[in-house]
Amino acid sequence: MIRNKCLWWGLLVSASVFLVLPNAQSKPAKKKAKTTTAEASPAPEATPSLEPKALDILKAASSRLAAAHTMKFTAIHFYESPSRQGHPLAFTTKSEVTLQRPDKLRVIMSADGPASEFYYDGKKIMAYAPAENLVAVADAPPTIDAALEQAYHSAAIYFPFDDWIVADPYKEMSEGMKLAYYIGQSKVVGGTTTDMVAYIDHGVFIQAWIGAEDKLPRLLHATYLEDPERLRHTLVLSDWQLDAAVPPDTFASAKAASANPMPFAHPHPEASPGTEPTAKGKPPKKQ
């Protein structure tokens, strides 16, 4: 759910997912056993690392989103970044997202930094910076999943909600899942009853609030486990509209197309692949 800043891409931070340390406290040290003739009690049954109930909730959310032909929602991303004094400062981005499977995506983002716009129409990717009147355009692959991969690898463009808009969200998260458990229910988040689950995905600990009835993700709270600063990231998802009509001209912008061109390229091309700490970037996918 968080990434490095992308040059003109404003305060867009990459992070396919959020993580947060597990709620459980560290296990207390065992007391020295007393000598006794009584038969030792059997060891308690180990809790599975991947609880079926938690997996079922994540699968249901994935299935609900994957089945939608069109999708609209608002994503507000709160993330921390170190200040010059060393204290973590919180910044925010707001994304208005419109998607049409299998090959169209628009993201209109406002932020504490420069605003940005992203268009994908199945043939071209267009990234537009309104304040600077700059646009980067590239030929695009025929699916949203492939376009997101290209945008990240070519230009370090990443959205914190990426993992929830791909063709099969559960497949994406399950490939790197190491832990998943059910926490309970909340009646506070999103104005509805949500099921709370926690899981580790590609080195990120995530707590998710998912609608108990509609199966839609409402809140994600995450921290990279390998980040020594334990910076926190929160994604609020709201205003869901599934299978609503989308005008044909949604995924293009004449104003963006006429802006001053700039290369569709990584903002730091001198950086060698793999030099970024894992905690600061999107975990690489398995091949």
Segments predicted by a language model, with ranges:
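Bacterial N-terminal signal peptides
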Residues: 10-19
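Bacterial N-terminal signal peptides that target proteins for export
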Residues: 1-10
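N-terminal mature ectodomain segment of secretory-pathway/periplasmic proteins
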Residues: 49-134, 206
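Gly/Pro-enriched, hydrophobic low-complexity segments
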Residues: 76, 111, 126-127, 175-267
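Long, low-complexity, intrinsically disordered segments
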Residues: 27-32, 278-287
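Sec/Tat signal peptide C-region and signal peptidase I cleavage site
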Residues: 20-25
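Flexible, processing/modification-adjacent segments and terminal tails
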Residues: 41-59, 63, 85-87, 128-193, ...
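An acidic-aromatic
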Residues: 27-37, 98-159, 228-233
